[in-house]
Amino acid sequence: MTFNHIDIDLQELNRIQDGQIRFYVTPEGNRYPSITTVTSHKNRQIFVDWRKRVGEEFANRKTNRSTKRGTATHLLIEHHLKNMPIPKADPLPTYLFKQAIPTLNRINNIHVLEGTLYSDQLCLAGQVDCIAEFDGELAVIDFKTAEKEKPEDWIEHYFVQCMAYGMMYFERTGHAIKKIVILMTCENGDVVVYEKRNKLDYMKLLKEYITDYLDFHNGK
């Protein structure tokens, strides 16, 4: 399959790392935190408790493996969607990518692929995996890897993050997304698609996430 790409003029943003927080600098010189920083903050205590429960050594090993798996699989997906030759990779990401191909081929008319976005209204920025049509409808699409399918209540922050990208994209271009899509390719052989159309619900949750983040950093 050959993927069609829509020519959208978006300016790439510079990134700045300040301690644990990643910022993006807009063309106007504003410095906005990444949406990933905000959504991660919301779940910070869950991960602190998990690390205490399993131990630092195991937690670091698990986290590093997950990061490596995700980065390598993302690269293969990106090449596929760019109609480029697929590079060689380790067996696991190759397997995760190949089993996802039939689902990836439901994507077309790609607006953004690994592109940076920002919102002056939200005072947020970030790098989105993909904005494209999925089954013929414009969507923010996030690619995830996992050992097995995750319950939806574990991944609320994925949907919130995607909604933020949708709002950023509308502010930048005037194009409104129809839905959020999480495409999760799993080590157990499952390829799971989570689709959400209740955008207003995730807009409200995003506001809560932002408030929680700002209250923490403002000492409230």
Language-model segments: residues:
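Metal-dependent nuclease catalytic cores that hydrolyze phosphodiester bonds in DNA/RNA
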Residues: 1-125
